[in-house]
Amino acid sequence: MPIVVTQAHIDRVGIAADLLDASPVSLQVLGRPTAINTVVIKTYIAAVMELASKQGGSLAGVDIRPSVLLKDTAIFTKPKAKSADVESDVDVLDTGIYSVPGLARKPVTHRWPSEGIYSGVTALMGATGSGKSITLNEKLRPDVLIRWGEVAEAYDELDTAVHISTLDEMLIVCIGLGALGFNVAVDSVRPLLFRLKGAASAGGIVAVFYSLLTDISNLFTQYDCSVVMVVNPMVDAEKIEYVFGQVMASTVGAILCADGNVSRTMFRTNKGRIFNGAAPLAADTHMPSMDRPTSMKALDHTSIASVAPLERGSVDTDDRNSAPRRGANFSL
């Protein structure tokens, strides 16, 4: 099924704009204060909404890569270079590691990948050949599948796939579409995992990666996003248990795969931490309804998009063919 912009997503545009316009999250890039350029993310949202308006809400066959829709995909304010950067023990692509000092706002709950889960990151992991991508696409079924750092395979041909090449692009899609209520997954964070420098833990992963996951999770919490990230440490089954334990104990929610099935879970929910699958996976339950008998309402944030009211007579009320709602008018 292609990515579809529904009434519920449109209703979230104003909320997303408020979150993006709020005080910027305090970040550290290579040890120096910086901030995210949220204008880039709002521009991306506007571009995606405009494309959806031309196709009745469906983004089937539409290229929504940030590199295609935006002139500049850099979302970090660029600090001045220092000679000390060359000797830094941390190097994440071109931007360096960043940190988010604690939560900037209260988390909200989501219904994906499990009921009542807090906004942020859920790590999907497993040993080599454990079926992580199978679990992601057949059991969790995300609305948007970000493909990053993986070799070409059948999943790249899915209508939900968005192909990116940088950390900035990954954050633009996760925050931009995640803040609108889409279930977003990243397959995978291999470029982050393999390019970090520093001492490795017993599981073979650079220790700073665990804090990086927490930082990214706190960043997504600021914008009400629930994102599943595939972690592929390329270790055997014995070591993956250690890695899972480290992630579960000190960073983010986690799902462990084995032989194409979910073997263990730990979700951070509004009822506390839930271990070992007591909270079932909830694929598609957070998917906004396309047949609500409501009209599209005009948005306050015209800088992102404005939606003309929908005439009741143009709504496919029975929605028997599962087609997107018709009659929507988007304008920028």
From Swiss-Prot:
**According to its UniProt record, which reaction does this protein catalyse?**
a ribonucleoside 5'-triphosphate + H2O = a ribonucleoside 5'-diphosphate + phosphate + H(+)
Domain of life from the UniProt record: Viruses
Tell me where the transmembrane regions lie.
none
Checking InterPro entries in the record gives: P-loop_NTPase, Packaging_enz_P4
For this UniProt record, give its keywords in alphabetical order, as a comma-separated list.
ATP-binding, Capsid protein, Hydrolase, Nucleotide-binding, Transcription, Viral genome packaging, Viral release from host cell, Virion
Q: Where in the cell is it found?
A: Virion
Query: What segments bear the compositional bias annotation Basic and acidic residues?
Result: 313-322
Instruction: Name a single GO biological process.
Output: viral genome packaging
Per UniProt, what is one Pfam family of this protein?
A: NTPase_P4
Disordered: region residues: 310-332
Using the UniProt record, give the first listed, main subcellular location: virion
Instruction: Look up the EC number in the record and give it.
Output: 3.6.1.15
Q: Where is this region: Involved in the regulation and mechanisms of transcription, replication and genome packaging?
A: 111-138
Citing just one GO molecular function, the answer is: ATP binding
> Which residues are listed for ATP binding in this entry?
126-133
Under the subunit heading, UniProt states: Homohexamer. Part of the packaging complex composed of RDRP, P4 and P7.
What the protein does comes down to:
Packaging motor with helicase and translocase activities. Part of the packaging complex that packages the viral RNA segments, replicate them into a double-stranded form and transcribe them. is one of the structural proteins of the polyhedral procapsid, which is responsible for genomic replication and transcription. Displays single-stranded RNA-stimulated NTPase activity.
The protein's name in its UniProt record: Packaging enzyme P4
The taxonomic lineage of its organism, from the top, reads:
Viruses, Riboviria, Orthornavirae, Duplornaviricota, Vidaverviricetes
